[in-house]
């Protein structure tokens, strides 16, 4: 990866900004010579740079959680991070993760990628195919997706007997056993109004769309098809388990 121009952190003391700039100088560069002649492109570049500065700041906070066990950074901490990264044998990989963090939809994702980079720095994580699946998913998940992902795994914690969950179960906060009973009652009475009302609700539609999206990212797996109006079920998987652990790491600092 080529060395890049500096990206200064925003909303921080001057010395922190300057120190962070030394580290982020190896990050992503957005320079278009056309911007010198076009005020529109210059404005767009400035706005895009500010967005990436915020992403880098969140990445560093996640990195600090792992390396220093705290989120807030001093200028000395930033200098130490810079030193640790430069001498780390995985420096290129860490900078690749930083590059992905600047492209995330969610600021939470940038912070989670910082935690992952910290694990790489400390030799606690080796990048395999699953790690790249996780990185790609985090790059594309928005805050709504992350909240819905947490709902799924919180459900599995609350209903430990269940290995899969339907969207209806999440909306109604009922176990799969209760859901099957509701489905059987509908079949016996031929009254599907309860299920239909749930499935026609906008909250249901948005939640199911988000869950299907996450299954496309391979963060959740699609489970066995249920014989019901809401036939799609979702299961956790190894990548999802890793993501839930990472979320728990950053939530300890909230």
Segments predicted by a language model, with ranges:
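Terminal, membrane-proximal amphipathic helices
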Residues: 1-8, 202-203, 232
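Membrane-inserting effector segments that mediate pore formation, membrane fusion
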Residues: 2-66
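Short, flexible coil/linker elements and helix-boundary hinge sites characteristic
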Residues: 6-11, 24-26, 38, 68-72, ...
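Extended hydrophobic/Leu-rich segments
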Residues: 7, 31-34, 81-85, 149, ...
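Eukaryotic partner-binding/assembly regions in large regulatory complexes
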Residues: 37-125, 129-133
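Long, helix-rich, hydrophobic modules that act as membrane-proximal anchors or helical bundle/coiled-coil regulators
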Residues: 103, 107-254
């Amino acid at each position: 990866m080529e060395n890049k121009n500096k990206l200064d952190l925003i909303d921080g003391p001057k010395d922190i900004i300057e120190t962070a700039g030394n580290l982020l100088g190896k990050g992503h560069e957005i320079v278009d010579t056309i911007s010198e002649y076009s005020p529109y492109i210059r404005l767009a570049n400035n706005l895009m740079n500010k967005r990436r500065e915020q992403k880098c700041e969140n990445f560093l906070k996640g990195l600090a959680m792992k390396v220093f066990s705290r989120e807030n950074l001093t200028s000395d901490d930033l200098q130490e991070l810079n030193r640790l990264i430069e001498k780390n044998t995985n420096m290129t990989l860490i900078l690749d993760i930083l590059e992905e963090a600047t492209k995330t939809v969610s600021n939470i994702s940038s912070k989670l990628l910082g935690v992952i980079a910290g694990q790489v720095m400390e030799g606690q994580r080796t990048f395999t195919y699953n790690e790249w699946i996780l990185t790609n998913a985090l790059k594309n998940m928005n805050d709504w997706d992350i909240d819905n992902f947490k709902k799924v795994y919180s459900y599995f914690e609350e209903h430990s007997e269940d290995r899969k969950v339907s969207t209806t179960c999440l909306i109604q906060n009922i176990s799969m056993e209760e859901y099957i009973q509701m489905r059987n009652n509908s079949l016996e009475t031929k009254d599907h109004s309860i299920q239909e009302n749930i499935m026609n609700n906008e909250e249901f539609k948005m939640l199911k769309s988000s869950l299907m999206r996450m299954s496309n990212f391979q963060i959740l797996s699609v489970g066995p098809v249920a014989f019901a109006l809401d036939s799609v079920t979702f299961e956790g998987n190894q990548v999802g388990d890793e993501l839930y652990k990472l979320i728990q790491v950053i939530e300890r600092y909230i």
